[in-house]
Amino acid sequence: MLVGGLHKPMTRILTSAAALLAGLIFAGAAASAHDLAEPTVFRSRHGVLDLLMIARAKPISTITYAPPTGSPMNPTGWVYEICRRPASGNTCPADAAVADYGGVRLALQKGDTLKIRLVNQLPQLDAAKVNHNADPGQANLFRNPTNLHTHGLIVEPRAPTLKDQTFGDYVFVQIFNSANGMPVPQTTHQHGSNKMDYADYRIDIPWNHPSGQFWFHPHIHGISLNQVSQGLAGIISVGEVSDYAHGDARDTPFPDASVRHLILKDLQVAPGGPVQFDSGPANVQPGEVINQQDPGFCAQFPADSSEVREGSCPGVDTSADGGSNFSGGKWFFTVNGRTFPKIKVTDSDGEVWRLTNASGSLSYNLQLTDDETQKPIIIQLISVDGVSVNLPQDTTMDTMVRLGGARFRVVPCPPLPTSRFHSKPVCVTQMVMMPSSRTEVFVTYRDPATGAIASPGRSASATFKMAGLTMGSGDQWPAVDLAKVHFHQHGWRNHIAYGLDIRGDALATMQPSGILDAKVPYASAAPLRDGCRPLPPGHRRRIFFGLADLTDDGTFGLGY
């Protein structure tokens, strides 16, 4: 059997030991300064994950910016300092705290309970840099209130009660840092209840919740963009990839040791001087982070071949067109908090990449480009926004292209024996990830001519990149190289012959016993208003979301 093929049964013990060793190296070895490390993981214990999470400012040690004048510096981001919750107090022990700009992963299982005390220690802001012209709720934005939202989880948006003072996934609460002053009353656009300094959350994960990847971030109307853009975001996993992704060779769950989590964030660092914000111009200091981001910070494409964009692009001057002068500034693009890291793919069966766009406003147009051929490498699509891809075997290519739309460039997979797969594999060469989106893909080296899984040469490599994206008449996002990928897959393949077999764990949500059919235990029907009557059996109510007043373009109404 050739290297790179499936192993024979008699070699199972040796190859399993090698795979175990590779998995231990992947999961536990310390990464070098330029190797991509996994996000720090906080796992539930005995069905509970109980954390203290402190939102605060911190210099980003993994990013160095050299201003036009002055010494190199680490720009200041906002991070979640996290530890397992101590018995008392709102501070983390110094030897137990994690405060990574790149983000952490909260690893949960179905049926778990997530408990978080969220403490606000964020700095006060300059109102001129956060206010929005047409936002009537901006009076308290400069005080930098925050809260927490577990994006994508199917959980209760529960408010506190007399018996239970904790919040569920409830976005209508504002947590203020008392050091920034007391919030003023608002007569219009009151966000919800106010809490000072901290709030306690208890989020119950249903036992029938689908496995997948989700994320958490602030959800304060009017300032969540600023807070996410400055770094406040992390990821959540429920269950394992192996719950819905199996190897096709022997129907074996894909090994969790070969699952890689990539959190994509970006940071605009200004050279100093006047900057155009929503409410008008304001001066910024050299090295200050622009968290009300400007899509025109740098040119969409390099000026010429001499401009190397490895993890960043240089600021440009658009003041002649009414923009800002960002010359000398830099727009950083990070993977797990690092700019242009190295990714070493060592498992012969390849890796599953779980990608999260944790940027505040940036949309990514992603490709994995073979460095030798300069052509995109085929990757298999596994999951989109926490929903595993499970298409019927008879799905046509035309249907898949239509389903992919402008988000995925769907291409034919290399020839596959249908008997090995429960669903139709979907292959892509390009994918657009808008803010908050998550995508899971199967990555392995492939023959450049056929696209089939193959054993790489000694120097096989690829570039994980943003190809540049134009949003119609809207924003233009730049082309930047995000990471260098090296393929070192020279052993026997244990699980994969042609691709991953996707079982579609998310389909169970639609079944009679699924989570979307479950009733909230304490919920009861609200009294009918005058003129309303119950719907007849089999009927559905349609609710229109849109503008309540078409003459006022600053108003957005829900439920009209």
Go through the PLM ranges and name each one:
Residues 107, 205-208, 445:
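Short, flexible loop/turn segments at beta-strand junctions in immunoglobulin-like
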Residues 114-116, 190-202, 433-443:
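Short Pro-Gly-centered flexible turn/kink motifs
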Residues 150-187, 268-271, 284-523:
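Histidine- and aromatic-rich segments of cupredoxin/plastocyanin-like copper-binding domains
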